[in-house]
């Protein structure tokens, strides 16, 4: 595919070089060769040549008009003027049909078979699909044939020559696109600003919580130290006693039981002597 595009550029340059020095019938013959040459789908540079424009006021005006149809028109445009234009070869018909598909693809990316059959004046779907496959291999467009839904889905198509009267419409379209981009950019900037504000609020809240926790720790430490000082004890020892009140109670209880045991044994010995 890429090799075809490269060869196409070389062929087009060759035709342009030959056209610079050609006039009259020789130039008209060269134009017909350009219209039939495989891979050549752009004709604006040829139309801009002064000697080519002179054909419009000569005996070869029909050839000049045919060139403009290939540059800007469609196969339907040719059929509408066929009586005043030179007949097309099969290769020229296929090329003009390829360009007609490109024109349709610029307006809609999913083109029904019915629309294509009418626009290209084809009799059946087989001819249509063969034509589209040929256009794909020529790198005129890329897409897929949806046979189930009977439509052509276009992913890419080449650009066509632009007429001077279309420049204002193109400029307007670009201006609208720029305005749309500015609106989108403004919306993005607003969202970024909101995100930054939310981030700052969360950071402030985090710092506030950390400050409150630090103050609370200081308060607890001061309160504990004051309580320990009031009882003339070491603050750490005071905290230890506060944490383990139950363990101190359990250590005193066994001593009481032991004393009770000794008392019983002593009384038993005294009772024995009296007997």
From Swiss-Prot:
Name-wise, this protein is COP9 signalosome complex subunit 7a
> What does it do?
Component of the COP9 signalosome complex (CSN), a complex involved in various cellular and developmental processes. The CSN complex is an essential regulator of the ubiquitin (Ubl) conjugation pathway by mediating the deneddylation of the cullin subunits of SCF-type E3 ligase complexes, leading to decrease the Ubl ligase activity of SCF-type complexes such as SCF, CSA or DDB2. The complex is also involved in phosphorylation of p53/TP53, JUN, I-kappa-B-alpha/NFKBIA, ITPK1 and IRF8/ICSBP, possibly via its association with CK2 and PKD kinases.
Q: Residue limits of the PCI domain?
A: 2-159
Family under the similarity heading? Belongs to the CSN7/EIF3M family. CSN7 subfamily.
- Its predominant location is cytoplasm
Question: Ranges of Basic residues compositional bias?
Answer: 254-263
* N-acetylserine: modified positions: 2
Indicate the segments annotated as coiled coil, or none if absent. Answer: 185-233
Instruction: List the GO cellular component terms.
Output: COP9 signalosome; cytosol; nucleoplasm
Composition bias of kind Basic and acidic residues appears in 235-244
Q: How is the protein modified post-translationally, according to the record? A: Phosphorylated by CK2 and PKD kinases.
Keyword Membrane assigned to the entry: answer is no
């Amino acid at each position: 595919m890429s090799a075809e595009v490269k060869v196409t550029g070389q062929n087009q340059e060759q035709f342009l070089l030959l056209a610079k020095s050609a006039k009259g019938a020789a130039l008209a013959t060269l134009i017909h060769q350009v219209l039939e040459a495989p891979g050549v789908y752009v004709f604006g540079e040829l139309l801009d040549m002064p000697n080519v424009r002179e054909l419009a006021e000569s005996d070869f005006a029909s050839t000049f008009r045919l060139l403009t149809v290939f540059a800007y028109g469609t196969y339907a445009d040719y059929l509408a003027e066929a009586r005043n234009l030179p007949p097309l070869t099969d290769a020229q018909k296929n090329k003009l049909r390829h360009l007609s598909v490109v024109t349709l693809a610029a307006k809609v990316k999913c083109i029904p078979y019915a629309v294509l059959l009418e626009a290209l004046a084809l009799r059946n779907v087989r001819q249509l699909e063969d034509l589209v496959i040929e256009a794909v291999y020529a790198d005129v467009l890329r897409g897929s044939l949806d046979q189930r839904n009977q439509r052509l889905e276009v992913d890419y198509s080449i650009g066509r020559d632009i007429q001077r009267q279309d420049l204002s419409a193109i400029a307007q379209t670009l201006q609208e696109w720029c305005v749309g981009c500015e609106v989108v950019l403004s919306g993005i900037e607003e969202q970024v600003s909101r995100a930054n504000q939310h981030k700052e609020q969360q950071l402030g809240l985090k710092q506030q919580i950390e400050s409150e926790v630090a103050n609370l720790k200081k308060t607890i430490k001061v309160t504990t130290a004051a309580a320990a000082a009031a009882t003339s004890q070491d603050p750490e020892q005071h905290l230890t006693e506060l944490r383990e009140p139950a363990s101190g109670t359990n250590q005193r209880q066994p001593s009481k039981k032991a004393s009770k045991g000794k008392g019983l044994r002593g009384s038993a010995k005294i009772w024995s002597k009296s007997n």
